[in-house]
């Protein structure tokens, strides 16, 4: 009898859990909008236009995801420090903010399959004649303080002089535009965009690293994760990914290869 009671109790708990999980998407629909965190600190991934509206690659992805959900989106501009905690505290439903999928982050939030990839690239003044990593030695190179770019520079060109900034965009960009630095190392997507709009710069063709970027959400919601993964798979296979990438990085840009599972 006790065994039957335990089984019945477990079944009730499983049904209740399944109902709660299925209700997460329904909660968004009942609310009438989806809350999505984006990072508006760097073109072309996310920034504000002249009308102070959120625009950019990630913003377009978020809008398409909201359309798939059938509700409008309400954006929050999130910092790298706050985005995970805002998901876990349920202040946000999703984060589409150029978030790298790492084992450490995957322990506390769930990630969709990749909808973009990131890697480091080198940008330089054309007058600096930087063609290889070795050419950075003896040059002033702007990097974010304590970032992977900082560590990469110290390893790849120990003779370079780091010029530190806490925010590559806009502070590091300004240093380059004012020629207070010869070169810079940052996320390839940002630097490709910067070089396409500033004739004084050129980028090295190699992208160093290949880090997947995913849509993040609070753990414990397999229904929402499945929904978002289906969206990303269609986003890649339908050609929307390539079109969106070229919209923001230029018609001649080559979107990094993604696998739609």
Specify the residue positions occupied by each region the protein language model found.
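Extended ligand-binding regions for polar small-molecule ligands
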Residues: 59-68, 134, 139-140, 147-148, ...
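Short helix-initiation/N-cap motifs at beta->coil->alpha
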Residues: 75-85, 163-178, 211
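Periplasmic-binding protein-like
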Residues: 116-124, 170-171, 188, 192-233, ...
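Bilobed "Venus flytrap"/periplasmic-binding protein-like clamshell domains
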Residues: 35-44, 54-67, 100, 121-171, ...
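Acidic, polar ligand-binding/catalytic clefts
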Residues: 63, 67, 72-135, 202-207
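Extracytoplasmic small-molecule ligand-binding "clamshell" domains
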Residues: 22-98
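Ligand-binding clefts/hinges and TM-proximal coupling segments of bilobed small-molecule sensing domains
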Residues: 148-167, 199-204, 233-261
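A ligand-binding cleft/hinge motif common to bilobed small-molecule-binding domains
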Residues: 82-85, 99-107, 152-155, 177-209
